[in-house]
C-alpha cells in the first residue's frame, strides 16, 4: 500500500529479458491440479517465506522477481522492465503478455515489493496477497483464447512512490495508449475486515469510467461473495472511489481503473487506512510493520481460513471479471453456439436419413413381393435408434437417441410400377458436452415410387417434406488447464426447421440363388432451413442465431446385397447390406455462421469447420416377417472415412402390415 506523495520523477524503460512461458505446459496438469485460491496460496507462501524484505537492491527482491516471472509464465510471454529514478535508484517490473484478436488489451497489476529498508518485513498483506492473486488469475486464463489481450504486471517500487506503475505508463507508445482498455489494481487483500472494489477518482466527472466497479459488483452478487465499495462517509473520498496504489498512475489516461483491496472504510478517519477493528491488530492496521504484517500474527488474529478465503474469493471474482473484460467468455460462447448450430444441422440430416431408410426397407419388401395390380397395402410401425459417441474407425459424434412411428401405404399401379406415401413422426435427442442437449420433434411427409418389372433392373424415387421443432440447451464451459472451472453456464433456446427434397436411386441385381447383389447409384437433393432464434437467458453469453439455409446434393455409388430366406412357421427373413461411396456436390452444411452476443451486441463468426465431401456409408440389416402382418427389423448404419467421425447408429423396429 502506497501512502500519498506529491513527488513526480521520470522513469526510463529498459527491456531486460523475454521468455516464453508456455514451456510450463510440459508439467503434468493432472498431477498439479489446483482449486481456486491454491495457486495464489503457493505464490504467497513463497514470497513471504523465501523473500521477506523485497525492496530494490536486495537479493530478496531479485529472487522475488524470478519467482513472479516463473509464476506468471503459463501461457504468456514474460519479460522484465528495468526503470530508474532520482539518478541512481532502480527497480524493475515483471510483465506477462497474452495477445488478443482485437489488438486492444487490459492491464492487471499488483506490486510485489515491500516497504523500503525493512529486511524482515514479510509483507503478507501488503502486498504478497495482491501479487499472489495476480499470479493465479494469470494462471487461470493461461492458454484461453482472448479477444482483448491481457497484460499482467508485477510492479516494483510501489512503496517508493508508485515508481513501477509510473514507469510502465510512461513506456507506453501512442498506439498502446489508444488500445489500452482499462486497468485493475490489487493491493492488500487479507488484513481488512471487508473486501472492496472502487473506481478511480476520474469516475467522479465521468461516471462511465466506473463501469468495472459496477461489473465486479454484479459478478459478486451472482457468485454470492460479499463485496463492498467506499460508502463515501469522508467527503475527500467520494462514494465508490478509491486511491493510493498503482492504479493512480493510470488516472490521467481516461480509462476505467479498478482498485481491489480489503480494509474497513467505516473506521477511524473513514479513509480506508484503518483496516480492522480486530483487537488482535493493535492500531487497526498492519501496513509496513514487520511485527504485524506476517503470517504468524495474521493467522493468530484472523485464522488460516481468512488467508485461504481471500485468495479463493478474490480469485473467483477477478478471474470472472477478466474473462468478461477480455471477452474470453464471449469467444467461448461463440464457439459453443457454433457447435450447437452444427449439431442442429446434423440432427436435421439424420432425420432425413431415417425417412430414406424407411423407404429403402419398403422398396426391399416390394422387390420381394408378387402383388396383383390394383392392390393397396399399408404398414404402421415404430422404431428406436441409438447413436453412441464412439464407433468403428474413429470417434463418433455426440450420443443421440431417436424414437419414431410411421404410417405408409402403396398402390400397385401396374406390373412394374408401385406408388405410395408415408407420414412419420420422430423424437430425437442429442447429448452435448457438460449437460447440453438438442431435442427435436419432427413430422415428415413422403411420396415414393418403385419401378421394377421383375427383371434385374430397378429404379426408385421419393419426394419429401419435413418440419422440426427444436428445443436446445447448451453449456458455456471454460476450465483452467489443470485448474478450476472458470465458467459453467446453461443457455436454452427453441426454433423451427424445414426440409424438403427429392431422391432418385437405381441399380442392377445379379441373381445368386436366393441372393441378389449388384451395383447401385443415387442422387439425393435436400434443402434445409433452420429459423433464426435468440436464447432465453439474460446472460451476456446468450446468443442470437441467424437463419441457417443450405443445400445438400449427395451423389452415391456402391454395391448392395439382399436376400430372402424361408424359415419355419411361415416366417421369412430378408437380410440386406450395402456399401457406398458418397460425394457431396453442394453445401452439405454451413461452414460458418453469424452469432450475436447479448453481452455487447456484436456479431461474431462461428467457425463450424470444413465440410468433408467424400466419405463412405455402410449398412447391415435384416427384416423378419413373423406372420403375414407382423414384422420386425434390426439395422446398423455407419458413416466412415469422414473427418468428423463415423456416426454409427443401431436401430430396432416393429411394423404391422394391413
Task: Please place each PLM-identified region on the residue numbering.
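N-terminal capping segment at the start of a domain
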Residues: 28, 34-63, 69, 113, ...
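A non-catalytic alpha/beta surface segment that caps or lines the substrate-entry region
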Residues: 43-99
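Outer-membrane beta-barrel strand-turn architecture
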Residues: 102, 371-374, 411-415, 451-455, ...
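Acidic/histidine-rich catalytic neighborhood of metal-dependent amide-processing enzymes
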Residues: 119-208
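Active-site-adjacent substrate-binding region
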Residues: 194-328
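Outer membrane beta-barrel translocator domains of Type V secretion systems
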Residues: 339-512, 636-637, 642-649, 653-657
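Solvent-exposed, glycine/polar-rich loop segments of beta-barrel outer-membrane systems
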Residues: 392-400, 431-438, 469-494, 529-551, ...
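Outer membrane beta-barrel transmembrane domains
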Residues: 545-658
Amino acid at each position: 500500500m502506497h501512502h500519498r506523495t506529491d513527488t513526480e520523477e521520470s522513469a526510463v524503460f529498459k527491456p531486460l529479458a523475454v521468455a516464453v512461458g508456455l514451456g510450463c505446459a510440459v508439467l503434468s496438469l493432472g498431477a498439479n491440479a489446483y482449486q481456486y485460491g491454491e495457486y495464489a496460496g503457493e505464490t504467497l507462501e513463497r514470497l513471504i517465506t523465501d523473500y521477506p524484505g523485497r525492496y530494490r537492491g536486495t537479493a530478496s527482491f531479485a529472487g522475488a522477481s524470478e519467482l513472479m516471472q516463473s509464476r506468471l509464465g503459463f501461457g504468456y510471454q514474460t519479460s522484465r522492465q528495468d526503470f530508474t529514478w532520482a539518478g541512481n535508484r532502480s527497480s524493475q517490473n515483471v510483465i506477462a503478455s497474452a495477445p488478443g484478436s482485437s489488438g486492444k488489451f487490459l492491464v492487471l497489476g499488483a506490486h510485489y515489493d515491500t516497504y523500503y529498508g525493512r529486511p524482515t518485513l514479510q509483507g503478507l498483506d501488503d502486498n504478497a496477497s495482491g501479487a499472489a492473486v495476480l499470479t493465479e488469475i494469470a494462471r487461470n486464463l493461461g492458454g484461453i483464447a482472448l479477444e482483448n489481450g491481457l497484460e499482467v504486471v508485477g510492479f516494483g517500487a510501489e512503496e517508493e512512490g508508485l515508481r513501477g506503475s509510473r514507469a510502465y505508463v510512461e513506456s507506453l507508445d501512442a498506439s498502446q495508449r489508444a488500445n489500452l482498455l482499462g486497468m485493475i489494481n490489487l493491493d492488500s487483500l487479507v488484513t481488512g475486515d471487508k473486501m472492496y472494489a472502487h473506481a478511480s477518482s476520474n469516475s467522479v466527472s465521468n461516471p462511465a469510467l466506473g463501469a468495472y466497479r459496477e461489473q465486479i459488483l454484479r459478478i459478486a452478487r451472482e457468485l454470492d461473495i460479499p463485496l463492498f465499495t467506499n460508502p463515501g462517509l469522508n467527503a475527500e473520498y467520494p462514494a465508490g472511489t478509491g486511491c493510493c496504489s498503482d492504479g493512480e498512475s493510470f488516472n490521467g489516461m481516461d480509462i476505467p481503473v479498478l482498485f481491489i483491496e480489503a480494509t474497513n472504510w467505516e473506521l477511524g478517519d473513514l479513509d480506508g487506512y484503518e483496516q480492522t477493528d480486530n483487537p488482535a491488530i493493535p492500531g487497526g492496521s498492519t501496513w509496513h510493520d514487520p511485527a504485524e504484517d506476517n503470517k504468524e500474527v495474521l493467522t493468530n488474529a484472523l485464522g488460516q481460513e481468512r488467508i485461504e478465503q481471500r485468495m479463493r474469493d478474490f480469485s473467483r471474482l477477478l478471474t470472472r471479471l477478466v474473462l468478461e473484460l477480455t471477452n474470453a467468455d464471449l469467444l467461448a460462447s461463440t464457439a459453443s453456439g457454433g457447435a450447437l448450430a452444427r449439431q442442429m444441422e446434423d440432427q436435421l440430416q439424420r432425420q432425413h436419413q431415417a425417412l430414406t431408410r424407411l423407404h429403402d426397407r419398403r422398396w426391399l419388401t416390394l422387390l420381394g413381393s408378387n402383388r396383383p395390380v390394383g392392390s393397396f397395402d399399408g404398414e404402421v410401425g415404430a422404431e428406436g435408434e441409438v447413436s453412441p459417441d464412439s464407433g468403428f474407425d474413429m470417434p463418433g459424434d455426440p450420443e443421440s437417441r431417436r424414437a419414431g412411428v410411421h404410417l405408409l401405404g402403396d398402390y400397385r399401379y401396374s406390373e412394374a410400377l408401385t406408388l405410395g406415401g408415408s407420414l412419420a413422426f420422430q423424437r430425437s435427442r442429442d447429448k452435448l458436452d457438460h449437460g447440453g442437449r438438442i431435442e427435436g420433434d419432427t413430422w415428415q411427409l413422403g411420396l415414393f415410387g418403385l419401378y421394377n418389372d421383375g427383371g434385374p433392373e430397378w429404379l426408385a424415387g421419393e419426394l419429401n417434406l419435413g418440419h422440426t421443432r427444436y428445443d436446445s440447451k447448451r453449456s458455456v464451459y471454460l476450465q483452467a488447464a489443470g485448474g478450476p472451472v472458470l465458467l459453467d453456464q446453461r443457455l436454452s433456446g427453441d426454433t423451427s426447421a424445414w426440409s424438403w427434397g427429392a431422391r432418385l436411386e437405381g441399380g442392377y441385381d445379379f441373381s445368386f440363388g436366393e441372393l441378389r447383389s449388384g451395383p447401385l447409384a443415387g442422387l439425393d437433393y435436400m434443402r434445409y432451413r433452420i429459423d433464426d432464434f435468440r436464447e432465453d437467458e439474460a446472460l451476456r453469453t446468450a446468443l442470437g442465431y441467424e437463419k441457417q439455409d443450405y443445400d445438400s446434393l449427395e451423389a452415391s455409388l456402391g454395391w448392395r446385397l439382399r436376400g430372402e430366406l424361408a424359415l419355419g412357421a411361415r416366417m421369412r427373413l430378408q437380410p440386406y447390406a450395402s456399401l457406398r461411396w458418397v460425394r457431396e456436390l453442394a453445401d452439405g452444411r454451413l461452414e460458418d455462421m453469424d452469432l450475436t452476443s447479448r453481452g455487447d451486441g456484436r456479431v461474431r463468426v462461428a467457425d463450424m469447420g470444413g465440410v468433408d465431401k467424400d466419405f463412405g456409408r455402410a449398412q447391415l440389416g435384416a427384416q423378419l416377417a413373423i406372420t403375414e402382418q407382423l414384422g420386425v427389423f434390426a439395422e446398423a448404419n455407419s458413416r466412415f472415412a469422414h473427418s468428423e467421425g463415423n456416426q454409427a447408429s443401431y436401430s430396432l423396429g416393429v411394423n404391422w402390415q394391413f
